[in-house]
A protein has these predicted regions:
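Ubiquitin-like/PB1-type beta-grasp interaction modules and other compact soluble beta-rich domains
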Residues: 1-77, 81-99, 123-127
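Non-catalytic interaction/regulatory segments
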Residues: 99, 108-181
Length: 181
């Protein structure tokens, strides 16, 4: 058994090795009004699918923490890129920089973007979220990740991955859409 101490409430519980953080969160029955988005495990932020094999201190994070908000925003960016891929297969979105409590994005769809386009994207994002599609973290060899992104036409990511020098990498997948954050 592994011992997990929850920083949020100070309680410690025993779990079977290999338990994921979502299961740990459920077992502690925390009342987080904004929902949990990630967790700090021994001071390192991890996703809720992270599996625990040794004793750990865990602090669950929601959007009221800086790290939790960054996780939430990255998830929304992923949903945005999925919506644009679905609606405009040849389109491209470039997420640039924070500005005025939001982010500046450059959307290229081969013509000027209209308010109807924005409404369509917003509606499709809401549909993706309502469908409760899981965002999966895929761990694999870096060569496999490079092949995956090469097939997706993401030379920017293949270049980045080929220069890391790491044997293993990870990427995220949402209903067939792959991305790297």
């Amino acid at each position: 058994m592994v011992q997990i101490r929850c920083i949020n409430n100070g309680l410690t519980k025993q779990f079977t090795p290999g338990v994921n953080l979502q299961e740990v969160y459920d077992a502690f029955a925390l009342n987080m009004p904004y929902g949990v988005v990630s967790a700090r495990v021994n001071n390192k932020v991890e996703g809720l699918s992270f599996k625990v094999y040794n004793h750990k201190d865990v602090e669950f994070l929601d959007i009221t923490s800086d790290s939790g908000m960054r996780t939430y925003v990255r998830s929304l960016f992923f949903v945005l890129t999925k919506a644009i891929d679905d609606l405009y297969p040849d389109g491209e979105v470039i997420i640039e920089h924070p500005i005025s409590k939001g982010y500046f994005c450059n959307l290229r769809i081969g013509r000027p973007v209209t308010s109807a386009d924005v409404d369509s994207i917003k509606l499709h994002m809401q549909e993706i979220i309502a469908a409760d599609m899981p965002i999966r973290r895929i761990n694999c060899t870096t060569d496999e990740a490079i092949t995956t992104f090469d097939c997706a036409g993401r030379t920017d990511v293949t270049t980045l991955l080929s220069t890391t020098g790491k044997l293993y990498s990870f990427y995220y997948k949402l209903d067939g859409k792959v991305d790297f954050f």
